[in-house]
Amino acid sequence: MHLTVFLLKGIVGFLWSCWVLVGYAKGGLGDNHVHSSFIYRRLRNHERREIQREILSILGLPHRPRPFSPGKQASSAPLFMLDLYNAMTNEENPEESEYSVRASLAEETRGARKGYPASPNGYPRRIQLSRTTPLTTQSPPLASLHDTNFLNDADMVMSFVNLVERDKDFSHQRRHYKEFRFDLTQIPHGEAVTAAEFRIYKDRSNNRFENETIKISIYQIIKEYTNRDADLFLLDTRKAQALDVGWLVFDITVTSNHWVINPQNNLGLQLCAETGDGRSINVKSAGLVGRQGPQSKQPFMVAFFKASEVLLRSVRAANKRKNQNRNKSSSHQDSSRMSSVGDYNTSEQKQACKKHELYVSFRDLGWQDWIIAPEGYAAFYCDGECSFPLNAHMNATNHAIVQTLVHLMFPDHVPKPCCAPTKLNAISVLYFDDSSNVILKKYRNMVVRSCGCH
C-alpha cells in the first residue's frame, strides 16, 4: 500500500511487482554495502503501455516525444545541457550516486548482452562530472559557473536549435549581419523565463583583422521591411580580440520573455560584427561559426524557467484528483498485486520500517532515443513494520507513537502506523522534445531519502 501511495504517485508498487523495470536488492537504511543482484522479467505489452502512460503523466508529457534522429557527432546544445544536468544532479542526490552508478553499470552489462547499442541517442553513456570555467576554449562547450548559478532558481532548462536554414551573411546598405530564429511555442504554459542566453562559437578571425578588437552585437528584430534595414533593438554586446577562441554568451532574457507572452512578435535575432572604428565586417570573417561549422560548435539558445505558484497549485490539485480516482478504480488490483509481493517476501515484511533499494529503468521502456540522461535512477522505497515499541531509528512522529499505543488496546479498530518516506529528493531528466530541442527538467519528490513511521 505504502509503495503505491507514496512512491512515484502510485505506480512504483506496480513497477516493483513487474520486476523488469526495477532492480531489487535487500538492504536497509543503515546498510553500507550495495547489493548488485537484480531480478528481471519481460513486461507484457499491456503492462509496458500502462507503465509508459503513467510515467509520462508524472513527467508532465502528453505523449512520448519522437525527436529527429541525431547525427553521428553530438551537437553543441545537448553537450552544454549535459553539463547543466551534471551540476543539477550532483546537488540533488550526492549520497545516492554510488548506488546509481552501480545499478546503471549492472543495467549496461545486461543491455550489452541483449545487443543494445553502446550509445543509443548519440551522446556519451557515462556522463563525466562537469567542470565550470568562465570561458571555455574547448569543444564541447562547458557550462560556466554563471550558468550553474541560474539552476538554483530554475525548475526547467530548455535549449533551442536555430531554425534559419540558410547559413547566409546578409548585406544591406553596406551592413553585414546574420539571422537566427528559435521556436519558443513549445514552452509549457505557466513557465516564466528567469534567464535566457544566445551562444555562438568564435574561431580565430580572418588574418586581415589580426590586431583588431571586434565588437559583436545581438539585436532583436522588431519589424522587417523589403526595401530597407529592419527595425532593431540592441540586446547585448561583446568585445573580443581577433585571435580569441571560445563561446560568446549574450543575455537575451528580456526578448525571450516578450516572445513567450507575444509569440507573434518573434521575428528572430540579428548578429552583427564591426571593427573598433565602426566598420561593419562579414560575420564569418570575424570567426563566428554558423550552420556550415562542426556540430559541436553550432549556435543555440538556452532559457531557464520557473513554474508559477498558480501552476504548481493547479498541478497538485489535478494530481490529487487523479490519484483519488485511480485508487478507487484499482484498489482491488493493487491489493492483489501487493499480496503477491508479500507472499514472495514474507520475512522482509516482519522487519522494522526502513529504506529499501529500488532502481527504475527508463531504458527498459524503450525510451533511450529521447531520454539523454539518466538511463534510470535509484528511487528507493519504504517498507517494514511499525510495531511497539517504536525506537529512535524508526523516525516515528508523536502521532505514530500515540497511534501505536491505541492500536495495542484496540487492534480491531485502530491500525498500526504506516512505514512511509519522511524525506524525498528531486531528480533531473534530460530529454529531447518533438522538435529536437533539449529540455532539462527537475521533478520533485521522486527519490526516498529516509523512512519513518506515520
UniProtKB/Swiss-Prot annotation:
Renumbered residue ranges of the record's region Disordered: 318-343
- Does Translocase show up as a keyword for this record? no
Q: Which GO terms describe its cellular component?
A: extracellular space; vesicle
Which tissues is this chain's protein expressed in?
A: Expressed in the lung and liver.
| CDD domains assigned | TGF_beta_BMP5
- Which is an annotated GO molecular function term of this record? cytokine activity
Pfam families named in the record: TGF_beta, TGFb_propeptide
Stored PROSITE patterns:
TGF_BETA_1 (PS00250), TGF_BETA_2 (PS51362)
Those residues forming the propeptide, per the database entry, are 31-316
The residues forming the signal peptide are 1-30
Q: Which residues are glycosylated?
A: 211, 327, 345, 395
Places the protein is found: Secreted
Q: Where is the composition biased (Low complexity)?
A: 326-340
Q: Which family does it belong to?
A: Belongs to the TGF-beta family.
- What this chain does, per the record? Growth factor of the TGF-beta superfamily that plays essential roles in many developmental processes, including cartilage and bone formation or neurogenesis. Initiates the canonical BMP signaling cascade by associating with type I receptor BMPR1A and type II receptor BMPR2. In turn, BMPR1A propagates signal by phosphorylating SMAD1/5/8 that travel to the nucleus and act as activators and repressors of transcription of target genes. Can also signal through non-canonical pathway such as MAPK p38 signaling cascade to promote chondrogenic differentiation.
Protein name in the entry = Bone morphogenetic protein 5
Query: Organism source for this protein?
Result: Homo sapiens
